[in-house]
């Protein structure tokens, strides 16, 4: 599996890894993974991992750095479609109002990714679309985003349908 890994630390001593991995065959149907490969497309997962937990909140400066790295990677890979799945592995600091409304951790991360994606798009010199995918997985909501060039919107839609079909089984 092809991957690109970036590591960096914040001033509090937390170490972060940004990993982009061409891992479409993990969750796409074999037919679609083969189709994408034949057409020269690659689906890259975006993974941000924190080692250590000195600072509970990921600083905006660090998120901006992550955005810049993703933008640079995207520019260098013209047939890449990126995806990010918003998980609920660890809690995130939310305002009291958001907690009161029952906002899920995944939904909070979903909104954050949408904002960060807008920053990434401003750095790029190409038209980019965000294809959000929401799946109601029996109480464990799943939020996924596909980031693709506008000229690949049809491919992003095919991927979205394939993901939905996989979860519907």
Annotated model-derived regions:
Residues 1-169:
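Non-catalytic substrate-recognition and accessory regions of acyl/acetyltransferase enzymes
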């Amino acid at each position: 599996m092809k991957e690109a890994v970036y590591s960096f630390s914040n001033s509090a001593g937390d170490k972060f890894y940004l990993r982009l991995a061409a891992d479409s065959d993990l969750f796409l149907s074999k037919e679609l993974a083969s189709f994408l490969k034949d057409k020269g497309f690659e689906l890259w997962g975006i993974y941000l991992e924190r080692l250590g937990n000195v600072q509970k909140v990921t600083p905006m400066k660090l998120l901006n750095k992550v955005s810049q790295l993703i933008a640079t990677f995207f520019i260098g890979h013209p047939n890449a479609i990126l995806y990010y799945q918003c998980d609920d592995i660890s809690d995130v600091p939310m305002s009291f109002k958001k907690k009161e409304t029952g906002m899920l951790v995944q939904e909070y991360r979903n909104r954050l990714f949408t904002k960060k994606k807008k920053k990434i798009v401003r750095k790029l010199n190409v038209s980019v679309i965000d294809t959000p995918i929401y799946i109601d997985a029996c109480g464990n909501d799943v939020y996924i985003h596909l980031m693709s060039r506008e000229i690949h919107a049809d491919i992003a839609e095919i991927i979205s349908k394939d993901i939905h079909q996989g979860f519907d089984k």
